[in-house]
């Protein structure tokens, strides 16, 4: 690893001080960062139907000062979409087979197919467009990007969570579209234990094969909601 010269350290210190001073003067606003967001409604069609509203937020740093500084960040707000069935509720999580970022990136690309997928600059461009006043986008979410679906054998026992095959419960289509509606909340009314849950539902090291853990050892409360307390 190379060393940093005193001159460069001093320069970084001056830049940091200037950025900090400007940030304080603007009441906490970073003058080098833009933010954008949009909301979308996800609607499930099939034997069981339902919908929920989510919000995607993104930040874009206009001026990257340091080599290891990221060009921006992103996150998803919302809660698992709940579908009512005769055998109990199903939950479409805030992640697909990849991750939470995998889900909202897939939704964003489905709504802006003309913008190439991948890379923060492309993602920022898409979110910025979808958050505009005239945004009116609607699309089918490809099946390979669908959220993970789970149910609980016992709603009062997080360890009883199990994965559900969408075809087995009659899910045929998922549609996403931009909206100005409020983000869906209220999942704690169904899962009263969720807000106090710490870590994964089952400790990963406690399962027979930690390299191939059950879904209960992978999931945590933030896969169900971003709107509950820590």
Regions found by a protein language model. Give the residues of each.
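N-terminal export leaders
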Residues: 1, 9-15
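Hydrophobic helical h-region of N-terminal Sec-dependent signal peptides
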Residues: 18-24
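C-terminal motif of bacterial Sec signal peptides marking the signal peptidase cleavage site
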Residues: 26-28
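Bacterial signal peptide processing site
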Residues: 30-32
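Alpha-helical transmembrane signal-anchor/signal-peptide segments
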Residues: 34-46
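Structured domain cores in non-transmembrane regions
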Residues: 49-160
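Glycine-rich, aromatic-bearing surface loops/beta-hairpins
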Residues: 153-230
């Amino acid at each position: 690893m190379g060393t940093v010269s005193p001159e460069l350290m001093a320069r970084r210190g001056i830049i940091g001080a200037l950025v900090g001073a400007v940030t304080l003067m603007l009441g906490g606003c970073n003058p080098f960062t833009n933010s954008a967001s949009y909301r979308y409604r996800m609607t499930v069609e099939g034997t069981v139907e339902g919908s929920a509203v989510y919000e995607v937020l993104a930040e874009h740093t206009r001026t990257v000062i340091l080599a290891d500084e990221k060009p921006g960040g992103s996150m998803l707000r919302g809660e698992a979409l709940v579908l009512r069935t005769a055998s109990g509720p199903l939950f479409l999580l805030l992640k697909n087979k990849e991750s939470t970022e995998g889900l909202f990136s897939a939704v964003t690309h489905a709504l802006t197919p003309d913008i190439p997928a991948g890379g923060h600059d492309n993602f920022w461009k898409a979110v910025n467009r979808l958050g505009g006043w005239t945004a009116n986008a609607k699309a089918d979410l490809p099946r390979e990007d669908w959220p993970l679906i789970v149910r609980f054998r016992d709603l009062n026992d997080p360890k009883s969570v199990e994965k559900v095959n969408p075809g087995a419960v009659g899910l045929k289509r998922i549609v996403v579209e931009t909206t100005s509606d409020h983000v869906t909340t209220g999942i704690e009314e169904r899962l009263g234990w969720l807000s106090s849950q710490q870590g994964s539902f089952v400790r990963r090291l406690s399962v027979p094969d930690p390299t191939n853990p059950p879904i209960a050892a992978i999931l945590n409360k933030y896969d169900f909601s971003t709107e509950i307390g820590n």
